[in-house]
């Protein structure tokens, strides 16, 4: 993005409203999910996620996170049902994480932070492209998955092995034959609410689907995330850590739960 936003004091979340006034809008993300305030909704369907590993293309350090991009020119990697109607295609996934294991997730649950959070970003195929869908109220659906410190997660290994090739901003390498289904928790019980992108331009276009059950990551694996750099090769190195936006006010929104 232009405007040079980031996560430092001079360009971080507290300053985003200067260039992106929607930062103070009515449906901003992330939020603190207060479990007592979330209402069970028996009309919410189970999530249906069908991903085709041949659609994964490449992995990129964009100077804010790293993302794995997918071919989205047909319906082979899709999210349907859950809280959404219609079909949403997978565009990319990325993570947010902290400088230490005590924080790093964007969403929190009853004030509890996790060390990292995975976001799988999908766009509504009633629009012609991701770009067209990105600012529409029903344009995007993002599945959020918390990472919790525990056992080494072998499912993350292929991603971690690619990190050395994308250490600095602007680096990209091919990343093929990957099925992100392997990154989902066993239980797909979720909370859902209307929200926004958590990075500029902060469009209020996201149906958030936050999985209740976290996946495992070891402290050693988290160190690999933190080995990436916010900076390009020729710049003074700055470690990619704390690339998360803090929780935003819930305002007039309701959080629904797919489970009792």
Curated annotation (Swiss-Prot):
Family matches, as SUPFAM superfamilies: Carbonic anhydrase
| Reaction(s) catalysed (UniProt annotation) | hydrogencarbonate + H(+) = CO2 + H2O
What's one GO-annotated cellular component?
Answer: plasma membrane
Q: Which residues form the active site?
A: 64 (proton donor/acceptor)
List, separated by semicolons, the cofactors it needs.
Zn(2+)
> EC number(s) in its UniProt entry?
4.2.1.1
Q: Biological process GO terms, please?
A: carbon dioxide transport; regulation of pH
Q: Which domain of life does the protein's organism represent? A: Eukaryota
Q: Does the keyword Zinc apply?
A: yes
List of residues binding substrate: 198-199
Q: Where are the transmembrane segments?
A: none
Q: Where is this site: Fine-tunes the proton-transfer properties of H-64?
A: 7, 62
Annotated Alpha-carbonic anhydrase domain residues: 3-259
Positions bound to Zn(2+): 94, 96, 119
A molecular function (GO) term = carbonate dehydratase activity
Q: Which PROSITE patterns does this chain map to?
A: ALPHA_CA_1, ALPHA_CA_2
Per UniProt, the keywords (alphabetical) are:
Cytoplasm, Lyase, Metal-binding, Zinc
Where does it mainly reside?
Answer: cytoplasm
In which compartments does the protein localize? Cytoplasm
* Entry-linked Pfam families: Carb_anhydrase
Q: Which family does it belong to?
A: Belongs to the alpha-carbonic anhydrase family.
State the protein's purpose. Catalyzes the reversible hydration of carbon dioxide.
Q: What is the protein's given name?
A: Carbonic anhydrase 2
Organism expressing this protein natively: Pseudaspius hakonensis
């Amino acid at each position: 993005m232009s405007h040079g936003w980031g996560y430092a004091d001079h360009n971080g979340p507290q300053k985003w409203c200067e260039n992106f006034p929607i930062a103070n809008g009515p449906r901003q993300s992330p939020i603190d999910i207060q479990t007592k305030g979330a209402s069970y909704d028996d009309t919410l369907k189970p999530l249906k996620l069908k991903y085709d590993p041949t659609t994964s293309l490449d992995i990129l350090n964009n100077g804010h996170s790293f993302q794995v991009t997918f071919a989205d020119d047909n319906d082979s990697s899709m999210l349907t049902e859950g809280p959404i109607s219609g079909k949403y295609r997978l565009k990319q996934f990325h993570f947010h994480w902290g400088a230490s294991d005590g924080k790093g997730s964007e969403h929190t649950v009853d004030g509890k932070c996790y060390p990292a959070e995975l976001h799988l970003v999908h766009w509504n195929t009633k629009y012609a492209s991701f770009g067209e869908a990105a600012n529409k109220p029903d344009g995007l659906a993002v599945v959020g998955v918390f990472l919790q410190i525990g056992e080494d997660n072998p499912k993350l290994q292929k991603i971690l092995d690619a990190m050395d090739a994308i250490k600095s901003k602007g680096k990209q390498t091919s990343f093929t034959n990957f099925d992100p289904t392997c990154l989902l928790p066993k239980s797909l019980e979720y909370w859902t609410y209307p929200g926004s992108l958590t990075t500029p331009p902060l469009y209020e276009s996201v149906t958030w689907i936050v999985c209740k059950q976290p996946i495992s990551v070891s402290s050693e694996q988290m160190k690999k995330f933190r080995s990436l750099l916010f900076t390009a090769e020729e710049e003074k190195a700055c470690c990619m850590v704390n690339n998360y936006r803090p929780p935003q006010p819930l305002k007039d929104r309701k959080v629904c739960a797919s489970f009792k």
